[in-house]
Amino acid sequence: MKRIAALLLLCLLLTGCSWDSAEYYSATPHKIKEQKTDESIPAVSNYNELYDAVADIVEKGAVTGRMSVEEYRSISLENNLSFVETDIIKRHPIGAYAVESIEFEVGTAVGMNAVGVTVNYSRAPEELQGIKAAKDMEKAKTLIRETLTQCDSALVMRVTNYEETDFVQFVEDFAAENPDVVMELPQVTVSVYPESGDDRVVDIRLSYQTSRESLRQMQKYVQPVFTSASLYVSSEEEGAIVRYARLYTFLMERNAYKVETSITPSYSLLRHGVGDHRAFATVYAAMCRKAGLECFVVTGTRNGDARSWNIVRDGDYYYHVDLLSQSGFILYKDNQMNGYVWDYSAYPACGVAQQPAENNG
């Protein structure tokens, strides 16, 4: 009896050398130690099932895994194992983004033919855990807006209904439309994994010259100024032109301005009185929009030099406004913009009544 008990104890100790859900150990090169249960072992019998099983391991960010291949033809299995590694790395979103290589060990587990899988990642575990989910491009854009608002330097997201998008242009547009949020336009680097498909990982890196802490402090200063501007023209009893003019006064009389370019345009303009034509036009347009007034930023030239100015709306009419024209708040029609050149097709005609949209219903 003592000999039998000793043998049973030895068997129990040996079973501790087999795989569990997190990792596996192998005492011999080509044998997978048996366990008491096979509930956690998926069974695969063809390439699609093999791909899905390996993909599931990668999806979880697991380092090791295993699968039963009891019903898999041995000749096909050997060929498919070498192919599935390439397929996962090239075709699967997480595989393309984070997997360096995949190793396989053919043996037995729970008395069945099985394959052990070891995944070697090129990314740290926290990077994999930090991937955000986006069901479509609208959600992806929301995540980008949140990243810019928080002044974060990176966003990695998995977009399951991916569409080709100019992310650099999207960041530039958001920054131009929200100078109360984006203090500095970052340098944007975008990588997409894999190269094709509807399900992809998008890795966006944002490089700032200013520290995140400083950018957040700038936001705290700038945002109340925009709120004050809205309150300054909160009376809707005043006509649109009066409100545009009041916002002009609010901005232009705030500082004795020096016309220079800054990497933090809205903050430098509102706090230090330093800004260029682009900063004035962008900040003024944002103040107008937050007050419920329609306002565009126009990019063009004046006498051959780069120039930005605004277009505002009064009823059915649009007008040009150049805050740095040295002439005060004056509304201009298109034919009065001497020396200015812009893309006429990109903006509404100014000084001409707008035609109502045709109703095809």
Predicted regions and their residues:
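N-terminal accessory/pre-domain segments preceding catalytic cores
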Residues: 18-236, 350-361
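Mature secreted bioactive peptide module from preproproteins
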Residues: 169, 173, 177, 201-203, ...
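Hydrophobic/aromatic-rich core segments of domains that either
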Residues: 279-346
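Positively charged n-region of N-terminal signal peptides that target proteins for export
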Residues: 1-4, 8
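Alpha-helix N-cap recognition
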Residues: 43-49, 133-136, 262-265, 332-334, ...
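Periplasmic OmpA-like peptidoglycan-binding domain that tethers envelope proteins to the cell wall
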Residues: 269-278
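Secondary-structure boundary elements
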Residues: 210-270
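C-terminal motif of bacterial Sec signal peptides marking the signal peptidase cleavage site
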Residues: 13-16
